[in-house]
C-alpha cells in the first residue's frame, strides 16, 4: 500500500463563483494482482462491481440503473453515509476511458470540492499492476482542513486498504 498526500494549491471555478485556491490532496495506491489485465479490466469497468469492494461498515449504494460497462460521459449516482453528515448524494462522471487500460471519474456533486480518480492497469510479470490515483480537496476552508486531519484522510486510507484486500481475495484463485 502506497499512500501519499501532497499539498498543491490550484485555482478552481465552481459554478461561476469567483476563483479560489484550494489545497489538493493526493492518495496513491498500487497493487499487483495475479490475473490477466483483460480479466481485471472486465471487473473494474463494470459499475455494479463497485458494490463488491467497499468495507462492510461503509454505507454505499449505487442509485438507479447503470450500464454493463463504464464509458466516457457516463453519470453514476451513489448514496454514501458519511460520519456526522448522514446520507450524502454523490454524482460522478466518467470523463475518460482508454479501453482495457484506464478510466477517470470526477465528482460532479458530492462531499468533496474536488475528486478526480484515475484507475489504471498495466501488465507486469506475475499479473497486472493496478494503480488508483485520487486527487481531492475538501470544502469548508479551515474546517475541511481539520476534518481531513482528524478523520477524512484515515477514512480514505482505510477504505482503500479494504479495497486492496477485497480485490486480492476476489482474484486470488
Q: What does each model-identified segment do?
A:
Residues 4-9, 13, 20:
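Short, positively charged and aromatic/hydrophobic N-terminal segments
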Residues 14-71:
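Hydrophobic ligand-binding cavity/cleft-lining segments
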Residues 33-35, 80-84, 96, 111, ...:
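Beta-strand elements of well-folded, non-transmembrane domains
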Residues 40-44, 50, 76-78, 94, ...:
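Hydrophobic pocket/interface hotspot
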Residues 61-109, 165, 169-173:
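Glycine-rich portal/gate segments that line the openings of hydrophobic small-molecule binding cavities
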Residues 158-166:
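A non-catalytic, amphipathic alpha-helix used as a structural packing/dimerization or gating element
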Amino acid at each position: 500500500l502506497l499512500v501519499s498526500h501532497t499539498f498543491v494549491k490550484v485555482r478552481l471555478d465552481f459554478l461561476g463563483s469567483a476563483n479560489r485556491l484550494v489545497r489538493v490532496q493526493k492518495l496513491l495506491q498500487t497493487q499487483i494482482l495475479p490475473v490477466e489485465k483483460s480479466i481485471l479490466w472486465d471487473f473494474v469497468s463494470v459499475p455494479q462491481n463497485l458494490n463488491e469492494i467497499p468495507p462492510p461498515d461503509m454505507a454505499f449504494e449505487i442509485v438507479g440503473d447503470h450500464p454493463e460497462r463504464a464509458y466516457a460521459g457516463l453519470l453514476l449516482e451513489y448514496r454514501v453515509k458519511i460520519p456526522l453528515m448522514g446520507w450524502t448524494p454523490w454524482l460522478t462522471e466518467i470523463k475518460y476511458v482508454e479501453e482495457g487500460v484506464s478510466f477517470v471519474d470526477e465528482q460532479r456533486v458530492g462531499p468533496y470540492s474536488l475528486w478526480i480518480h484515475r484507475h489504471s492497469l498495466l501488465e507486469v510479470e506475475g499479473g497486472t499492476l493496478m494503480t488508483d490515483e485520487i486527487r481531492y480537496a475538501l470544502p469548508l476552508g479551515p474546517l475541511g482542513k481539520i476534518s481531513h486531519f482528524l478523520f477524512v484522510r484515515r477514512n480514505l486510507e482505510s477504505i482503500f486498504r479494504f479495497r486492496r484486500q477485497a480485490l486480492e481475495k476476489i482474484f486470488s484463485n
